[in-house]
């Protein structure tokens, strides 16, 4: 008996070696032989979850709190594969699973290498789904005891194996799968291979990733889960979105949104002025500190930007003048208009009602400008008048031009005016001094001051545009290129950016705007596709060499701020032109009007022009194309004005039309 027992292990070893060599043996025979040679398995011990064992180093000990799982079956010590005893010696040591943990046992090393989805420090660590485990348990219970033990043994081996061995085991299994099994495998892993990287990463990195998304993608991300929504709605992400789009064209998608409403800023400024004057402020008039989420700010601006893009607006018509309207200006609440009938009218924008009429000029009002405290007007009667537009009182009258005053522009200290006498007069409010700028050979139709650089721009019927030095009265440079009388010149904001080519042709944000609005024909206008617009000229040559005086005045050594980099002009040759100021080069010519252009307005997002052809056009500076054409006036459009959410046009038909693009 003792001899027979001593030879049994040798016989089993011989049979095992024979099985290893016999590669032609059928899988069923090999499985039967392997099962028959296995000693009876004992109750498996808990070995931790499989997600915590994908390592080439020692695994942590099991604790009494770990749930029992299908994957926790552990074979007896005598049946452990060599790689198991090499890599996880302590895991298969015989011990009571409910015994307290011995602190003297070896712990996992700090530099242990995990599969990236099984790292215990990651919140996205893979865990077996409870419904899946329950279903597998039920399916397993329908099998024979031997089959259950074999499958549990295989699962335990795979669960305890390091990453390299797991890959080899999987490769072998996949290589033996038939097509239905491969299809089952593909369907099973389709959802399992997804990972919630946003939850796993630090918030700073998640914010950085989300900041690269456009609006449509960001809104889609917010619908994934509660955690994604919390990150996608965060002020950090939407503040970055506002920086990219508000008051500028985004280089990625081409979208630009209007600036924020300035009403709150103006209210605060008004309170400061009242306090400085020693006046009491009622408690209900004091500005309250308010903080709007950046997402709400972007949402409001996006609605306005979409309305601009598709021409969705409401129109208010102001009637009251008895002759053509020649000039206008508006702010948040007030509209001021000047007419051939020698009057200036102040209107309430919200109600469309006339507030008061300013009378005093003896001829046509050709130009006006107002701020919070005063309104200054110029007339063909050769005078300039300063008004208190709130009371209607004329404060003072300036004379000096030998011809009618055609244009004016003022800042806090200086007034510039242009006249039929071919001159520009500079008036100083503080010391009452004046300076005359001579050089134009015909009427001066437009003047614009640039306070920072101490310069003034002018446009004339002599077909030229000039830039002047306010300190010396000298002409710095003359720009030639128009073939018709230049009616308007407009230095563009320093924030304006010009690019010859678009960086992004696909505008995914259009998906959020819904369907396009109906055509704005008749009183509203119509889309640019219906207008006889031509492609812009983007390769115009320089007009003439830059004046050495320009380079001498605006260098870093002088410390004098340079004028705005770009300016826009309009002329009776039917075109608008965009110029680079410091080189004198015409960058782009805008074609579309079929008669001369009289009115011009612009901001960083769009240009607006009014012409003899009874039409007003909105242009995209980025592409040079006409975005929309507005019709409805029965006479030439002589003047236009523009804000973030409104546009106004005045015409010789005595009407003013206000288009509001607010949501």
From Swiss-Prot:
Residue spans of biased composition, Polar residues class: 1-15, 56-77, 526-541
Return any one Pfam family short name. Answer: F-box-like
**Family matches, as SUPFAM superfamilies:** F-box domain (SSF81383), Quinoprotein alcohol dehydrogenase-like (SSF50998)
What are the start and end residues of each WD repeat?
Answer: 320-359, 361-399, 400-437, 439-480, 544-589, 592-629, 632-663
Pinpoint the F-box domain residues.
195-241
Give start-end positions of Basic and acidic residues composition bias: 502-522
Subunit composition and interactions: Component of the SCF(sconB) E3 ubiquitin ligase complex.
PANTHER family xrefs: UBIQUITIN LIGASE SPECIFICITY FACTOR/HREP PROTEIN, UBIQUITIN-BINDING SDF UBIQUITIN LIGASE COMPLEX SUBUNIT
Function of the molecule: Component of the SCF(sconB) E3 ubiquitin ligase complex involved in the regulation of sulfur metabolite repression, probably by mediating the inactivation or degradation of the metR transcription factor.
- Please state what the protein is called: Probable E3 ubiquitin ligase complex SCF subunit sconB
């Amino acid at each position: 008996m003792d001899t027979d027992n001593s030879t049994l292990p040798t016989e089993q070893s011989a049979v095992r070696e024979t099985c290893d060599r016999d590669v032609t043996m059928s899988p069923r025979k090999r499985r039967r032989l392997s099962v028959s040679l296995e000693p009876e398995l004992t109750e498996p011990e808990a070995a931790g979850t499989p997600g915590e064992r994908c390592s080439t180093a020692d695994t942590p000990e099991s604790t009494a709190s770990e749930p029992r799982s299908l994957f926790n079956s552990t074979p007896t010590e005598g049946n452990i594969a060599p790689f198991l005893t090499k890599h996880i010696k302590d895991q298969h040591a015989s011990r009571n699973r409910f015994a307290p943990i011995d602190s003297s046992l070896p712990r996992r090393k700090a530099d242990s290498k995990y599969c990236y989805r099984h790292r215990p420090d990651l919140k996205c660590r893979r865990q077996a789904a409870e419904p899946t485990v329950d279903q597998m348990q039920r399916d397993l219970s329908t099998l024979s005891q031997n089959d259950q033990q074999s499958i549990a043994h295989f699962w335990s081996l795979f669960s305890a194996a390091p990453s390299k061995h797991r890959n080899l085991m999987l490769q072998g299994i996949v290589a033996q799968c038939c097509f239905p099994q491969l299809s089952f495998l593909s369907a099973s892993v389709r959802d399992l291979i997804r990972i919630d990287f946003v939850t796993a990463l630090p918030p700073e990195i998640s914010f950085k990733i989300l900041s690269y998304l456009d609006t449509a993608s960001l809104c889609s991300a917010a619908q994934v889960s509660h955690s994604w929504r919390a990150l996608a709605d965060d002020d950090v992400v939407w503040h970055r979105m506002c920086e990219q789009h508000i008051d500028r064209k985004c280089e990625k998608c081409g979208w630009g949104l209007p600036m924020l409403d300035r009403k709150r800023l103006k209210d605060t400024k008004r309170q400061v002025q009242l306090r400085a004057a020693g006046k009491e402020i009622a408690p209900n008039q004091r500005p309250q500190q308010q903080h709007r989420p950046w997402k709400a700010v972007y949402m409001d601006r996006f609605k306005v930007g979409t309305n601009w893009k598709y021409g969705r607006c409401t129109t208010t018509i102001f009637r009251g003048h008895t002759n053509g309207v020649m000039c206008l200006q508006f702010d948040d609440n007030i509209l001021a208009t000047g007419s051939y009938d020698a009057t200036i009218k102040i209107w309430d924008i919200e109600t469309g009602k006339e507030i008061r009429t300013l009378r005093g000029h003896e001829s046509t009002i050709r130009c006006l400008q107002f701020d919070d405290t005063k309104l200054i007007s110029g007339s063909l009667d050769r005078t300039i008048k300063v008004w208190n537009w709130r009371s209607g009182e004329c404060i003072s009258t300036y004379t000096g031009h030998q011809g009618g005053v055609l244009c004016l522009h003022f800042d806090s200290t200086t007034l510039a005016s242009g006249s039929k006498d071919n001159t520009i007069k500079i008036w100083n409010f503080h010391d009452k001094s004046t300076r005359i700028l001579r050089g134009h050979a015909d009427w001066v139709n437009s003047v614009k001051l640039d306070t920072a650089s101490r310069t003034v721009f002018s446009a004339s019927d002599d077909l030229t545009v000039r830039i002047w030095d306010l300190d010396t009265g000298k002409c710095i440079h003359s720009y030639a290129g128009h073939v018709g009388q230049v009616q308007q010149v407009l230095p563009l904001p320093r924030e304006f950016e010009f690019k010859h080519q678009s960086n992004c042709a696909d505008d995914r944000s259009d998906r959020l705007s819904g369907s396009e609005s109906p055509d704005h024909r008749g009183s509203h206008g119509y889309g640019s596709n219906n207008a006889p617009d031509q492609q812009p000229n983007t390769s115009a040559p320089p007009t003439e060499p830059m004046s050495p005086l320009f380079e001498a005045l605006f260098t870093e050594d002088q410390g004098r701020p340079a004028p705005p980099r770009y300016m826009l002009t309009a002329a009776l040759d039917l075109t608008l032109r965009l110029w680079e100021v410091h080189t004198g080069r015409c960058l782009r010519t805008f074609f579309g009007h079929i008669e001369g252009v009289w009115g011009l307005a612009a901001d960083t997002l769009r240009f607006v022009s009014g012409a003899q052809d009874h039409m007003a056009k909105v242009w995209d500076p980025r592409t040079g194309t006409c975005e929309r054409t507005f019709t409805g006036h029965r006479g030439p459009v002589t003047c236009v004005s523009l804000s973030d959410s409104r546009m106004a046009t005045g015409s010789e038909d005595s009407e003013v039309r206000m288009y509001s693009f607010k949501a």
